[in-house]
Curated annotation (Swiss-Prot):
Subcellular localization(s) per the UniProt record: Cytoplasm
Protein name as catalogued: Chaperonin GroEL
Gene: groEL
Record-level GO cellular component terms: cytoplasm
UniProt-recorded Gene Ontology molecular function terms: ATP binding; ATP-dependent protein folding chaperone; isomerase activity; unfolded protein binding
Main localization category: cytoplasm
């Protein structure tokens, strides 16, 4: 296919137009007085949201060069969402600011490679300073504050803090839609491990790409299943019992996989296969954990187990199982509670005896999976539109909370970025264009606070100057229009979110500046209807 080419300034300007279109759409949502964006959907009602990455994912521009710019910044939002789960709007805004400031200098003749070096140095310094002012999360109150700021709702903050308290920091928290009007918390015993389905054809919900099994039987084995004959006697019993099946095995392949998928597609019976979690000895222990939780038996060569001789009473049971591409959650395993308690105590004894940090971490994980359970936040609302919006906000708040527990918290409202400006500004370079890169970051660090003020209808520059001249940690509460100690006021951001947003924005933006040529497909001209095949005018 023929291509169209743009070079130098023209290429960068076209791409910058796309960056600005995406970033200007996203940044209106920043801060306590940020607005929402409404997204048209091909099916169902439009989606109203203030989640940066959700908005960015929907944006495709008609002009190929503008679209390239937009897609690059979309990557900033997506990467930040993957790493920290929140802060996507801030990341997009920072990327736009770095690109804008950088292009001014590149146009004036600065070397983009040297600018990139300066940006990298400044970002490393800024991250180091952000980590210095970070404070660990202490107790339920701090967790509630982080969640409340992320979701812009104190009730949600309290709900998530309750969930974290009930299942512990290692526990699993999921967000589901509720049939009632209110949002509530439900804690269910359960276990999650990071192995997904072996074939996408096994899903029961093609929109969410997940398989949900109600009251399934659970076959647990450390063998590889490739021959369907090994499973046939057991499958016949399961079909007669009218049950669904979850298979946890070393692997499922070949003829066995094909037969299971074909039967699922024909509707004969529903079966989902997942690979066993962990490796080596840890895999054996984790399979035993699952067996204890579900009341099943691990069918293993070590104890002379044979799949052909397996019976229904060797299978575990659970109230429900949810399998996604990456994880499996077993809820309310029907195992003997006494045996589960014994298993938990056994792991606790191992924890006390081990000296290896790695082993401790893995044992702690197993303990959480056996004892912690799964907390389910059920989101309710009057309409589907409101429900989707609330669900996205709660998911963001949950991610922010987990990030805060991992790396601590910093003053919110863009204050952390402004607080580190002085230290970053002290950096110097003998090479002029590297110094330009450092100065770009110094200016860009002001941008989140400026935008929060702008969204509250205020002049950002005045507020930034006042914060710069205040004590460290003092910022601007845009909701109440007051200057205060942000951490004491409960206006906090997770360190991980603040750090990731800056690192990802700088990574993509500095690479963007080094672009000297852009190549895109020439759009195909649409043929008028009825043309072609020499049939015009025929009736």
């Amino acid at each position: 296919m023929a291509k169209t080419l743009l070079f130098g300034e023209e290429a960068r300007r076209s791409m910058q137009a796309g960056v600005d279109k995406l970033a200007n759409t996203v940044k209106v949502t920043l801060g306590p007085k940020g607005r929402n964006v409404i997204l048209d959907k091909k099916f169902g009602s439009p989606l109203i949201t203030n989640d940066g990455v959700t908005i960015a994912r929907e944006i495709e521009l008609e002009d190929a060069y503008e679209n390239m710019g937009a897609q690059l910044v979309k990557e900033v939002a997506t990467k930040t969402n993957d790493v920290a789960g929140d802060g996507t709007t801030t990341a997009t805004l920072l990327a736009q600011a770095i690109i804008r400031e950088g292009l001014k200098n590149v146009t004036a003749g600065a070397n983009p490679i040297l600018i990139r070096n300066g940006i990298k140095t400044a970002v490393e310094k800024a991250v180091e300073e952000i980590q210095k002012i970070s404070k660990p999360v202490n107790g339920k109150e701090d967790i509630a504050r982080v969640a409340a700021i992320s979701a812009a709702d104190e009730k949600i903050g309290k709900l998530i803090a309750d969930a974290m308290e009930k299942v512990g920091n290692e526990g699993v928290i999921t967000v589901e839609e509720s049939k009632s009007m209110g949002t509530e918390l439900d804690v269910v015993e359960g276990m999650q491990f990071d192995r997904g389905y072996v074939s996408a054809y096994m899903v029961t919900d093609t929109e969410k790409m997940e398989a949900v099994l109600d009251n399934p039987l659970v076959l647990i084995t450390d063998k590889k299943i490739s021959n369907i004959q090994d499973l046939l006697p057991l499958l016949e019993q399961i079909v007669q019992a009218g049950k669904k099946l979850l298979i946890i095995a070393d692997d499922i392949e070949g003829e066995a996989m094909t037969t299971l998928v074909v039967n699922k597609l024909r509707g004969t019976f529903t079966c989902v296969g997942v690979k066993a979690p962990g490796f080596g000895d840890r895999r054996k222990e984790m399979l035993q954990d699952i067996a204890t939780l579900t009341g099943g038996v691990v069918i293993s060569d070590e104890v002379g187990g044979d799949l052909k001789e397996a019976t229904l009473d060797m299978l575990g049971e659970a109230e429900s199982v949810k399998v996604t591409k990456e994880s499996t959650t077993i809820v309310n395993g029907r195992g003997n509670s006494e045996e589960i308690k014994n298993r938990i105590n056994q792991i606790k004894l191992q924890l006390e005896a081990t000296t290896s940090e790695f082993d401790k971490e893995k044992l702690q994980e197993r303990l959480a999976k056996l004892a912690g359970g799964v907390a389910v936040v059920k989101v309710g609302a009057a309409t589907e539109t409101e429900l989707k919006e609330s669900k996205l906000r709660i998911e963001d708040a949950l991610a922010a909370t987990k990030a805060a527990v991992e790396e601590g918290i910093v003053p919110g409202g863009g204050t952390a970025y402004v607080n580190v400006i002085n230290e970053v500004a002290k950096l110097t370079s003998d090479i002029q264009d590297e110094q330009v890169g450092i100065n770009i970051i110094v200016r860009s660090l002001e941008e989140p606070m400026r935008q929060i003020a702008h969204n509250a209808g205020l002049e950002g520059s005045v507020i930034i100057e006042k914060v710069k001249n205040s004590d460290a940690g003092v910022g601007f509460d845009a909701l109440r229009g007051e200057y205060k100690d942000m951490i004491k006021a409960g206006i906090v951001d997770p360190t991980k979110v603040t750090r990731s947003a800056l690192q990802n924005a700088a990574s993509v933006a500095s690479t963007f500046l080094t672009t000297e040529a852009a190549v895109a497909d020439i759009p195909e001209k649409e043929m008028p209807q009825g043309a072609g095949m020499g049939m015009d005018g025929m009736y």
